[in-house]
């Protein structure tokens, strides 16, 4: 699918089948994150792959709305090395979610509200921080993939030169 179609049709999914995400797809998703631009090309994003149900449960306990991680066969924590910022993590996350969707794999970003807890559960070095975790999997139903989500008209969002 072309980039514009991928962007327009991607929806967050919170219900997944138990079908595992193939290793080839995982590598493609991770490569998409790696290829994201970063401030001053610092490339601060690191990734922790979570497939084990118990590990996902322990990490999910660090977020307030992290249940999508429990249902997904795969989750990837985006970790920031020193000097990395949310801007860098966001660019990597969007690349990863779009690369997944191109393969029919849905996703849902999850915030880790207790970052110290998440860092402990993931065994991070003291100077690294969890930016977010993304749940990945095949959608439980076709309906969840194709629902129409209304968007604010572009004319209401865009201003030229000044507000």
Q: Which stretches of residues belong to each language-model region?
A:
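Acidic, surface-exposed loops and disordered segments
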Residues: 1-163
């Amino acid at each position: 699918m072309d980039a514009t179609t991928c962007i327009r049709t991607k929806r967050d999914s919170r219900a997944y089948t138990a079908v595992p995400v193939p290793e080839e797809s995982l590598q493609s998703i991770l490569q998409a994150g790696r290829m994201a631009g970063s401030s001053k090309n610092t490339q601060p994003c690191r990734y922790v792959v979570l497939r084990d149900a118990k590990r996902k449960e322990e990490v999910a306990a660090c977020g307030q709305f992290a249940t999508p991680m429990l249902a997904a066969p795969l989750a990837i924590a985006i970790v920031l090395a020193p000097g990395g910022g949310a801007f860098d993590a966001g660019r990597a996350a969007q690349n990863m979610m779009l690369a997944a969707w191109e393969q029919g794999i849905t996703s849902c970003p999850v915030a880790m509200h207790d970052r110290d807890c998440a860092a402990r559960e993931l065994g991070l070095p003291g100077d690294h921080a969890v930016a977010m975790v993304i749940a990945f999997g095949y959608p439980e139903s076709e309906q969840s993939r194709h629902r129409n989500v209304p968007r604010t008209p572009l004319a209401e969002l865009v201003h030229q030169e000044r507000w």
